[in-house]
Regions:
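Pore- or pathway-lining transmembrane helices of multi-pass membrane proteins that form conduits
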Residues: 25-29, 192-209
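Long, hydrophobic alpha-helical segments
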Residues: 82-107, 147
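Secretory targeting signals
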Residues: 134-189
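Terminal transmembrane helical anchor/hairpin motif
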Residues: 5, 41-74, 201-256, 260, ...
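Transmembrane helix boundary and interhelical loop/hinge segments in multi-pass membrane proteins
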Residues: 99-121
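Alpha-helical transmembrane segments of multi-pass membrane transporters/translocases
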Residues: 26-30, 231-284, 294-310
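Selective transmembrane-helix segments that form parts of the transport pathway or gating/packing helices
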Residues: 19-27, 125-152, 299
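Short, membrane-interfacial amphipathic segments enriched in basic
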Residues: 1-10, 215-222, 273-285
Length: 314
């Protein structure tokens, strides 16, 4: 059994070296943005009257669809406001980070022949996938801890340690979930574009299902990982069970990904690739058109991420 994971640690360190700039940029961006918003909200709405006026907006179905259901509206604190307006959008951003990083070190590495080269060395067949998961888990744990203690360090009464730990844990759990999900899709598909496409498709469906469920049917919200994580009711009731359920589902997905990786051939997948067009578009005849076509998926991913970031600003 141990030979399946030979030199996983060395591969993990290699992944860290490849991402010595990318991962820190993601972490610093997410953490600093979260703490900045946490520091700004009490200054924007310093009185209880102003906060109660904001609480009334959460009764609007459109707002509920965007950010999730409101909790603690009778005594709307800075912490409750922070969680209501930021947790869903930040969770989506963390999900995007995990999708892109996991796809890069699973299906993309396999598509470009890097995994084949690694397997020619003394490395276990499951070591590349395990190393990628290990690095993403560590990355999400760092986000969890830095967000939690960063928010607590602001010193606001309603942004307490327990709620801050749960806020950070919610982000870490949703990140681990989307990393495991992307690793699972990487085993089903045959190319990196499909892996990212399926993963982002699931993210979009999960967000829409959460929105509809929060407005009309809570069952849809509980099925969606984004809706489930909002049931933590951070800084109000501080429920930990959604985090535990999310991590549990992630473990199952991780196990399935490892199993599928062990039974399939290198470079293959379980979902057949549709045949391409017999003739290329005229648009592809120019260098710009070809570049846009090749980078279509990352561009769409970044547009979605920036749109969500803009919506969170407001």
């Amino acid at each position: 059994m141990s030979r399946l994971y030979t030199n996983t640690g060395k591969l993990a360190r290699f992944i860290l070296r490849r991402n010595r700039i990318r991962i820190p940029v993601w972490i610093v961006s997410i953490v600093s943005f979260t703490i900045m918003i946490g520091a700004m909200l009490p200054e924007l709405y310093p009185t209880s009257i102003e906060r109660q006026m904001m609480a009334e907006t959460l009764k609007n179905p459109a707002v509920t669809f965007m950010v999730g259901p409101g909790y603690g509206l009778d005594n709307y604190t800075d912490g409750a406001m922070m969680a209501h307006y930021m947790l869903a959008f930040t969770a989506v951003t963390v999900g995007i980070m995990n999708i892109l990083l996991t796809a890069t070190h699973t299906r993309e590495d396999e598509e470009y022949g890097r995994i084949e080269m690694i397997r020619s060395l003394p490395a276990g067949p499951l070591s590349p996938l395990t190393a990628a998961f290990l690095i993403l888990i560590i990355t999400n744990v760092i986000i969890f801890l830095t967000v939690a203690f960063g928010l607590y360090s602001l010193g606001f009464e309603s942004i307490d340690l327990g709620g801050s730990l749960l806020y950070g844990a919610s982000l870490g759990a949703i990140g681990i979930f989307f990393s495991a999900l992307t690793g699972f899709f990487a085993q089903l598909t045959t190319n990196n574009r499909s892996t990212i496409g399926y993963s982002f498709g699931f993210l979009i469906i999960a967000y829409i299902a959460r929105g509809i469920g929060d407005v009309e049917n809570e069952i849809l919200s509980l099925i969606s990982p984004l809706g489930l994580i909002l049931r933590t009711q951070v800084y109000v009731n501080n429920y930990w069970w959604p985090v535990l359920v999310t991590v549990g589902v992630s473990v199952v997905l991780f196990g399935l990904a490892l199993y599928l990786n062990s039974v399939r051939d290198l470079g293959s997948g379980f979902i057949p690739t549709k045949p391409g067009r017999s003739k290329g578009s005229v648009f592809l005849s120019s260098p710009l058109g070809l570049s846009l076509r090749l980078q279509r998926t990352p561009i769409i991913a970044w547009v979605i991420g920036m749109f969500i970031l803009g919506v969170s600003y407001g």
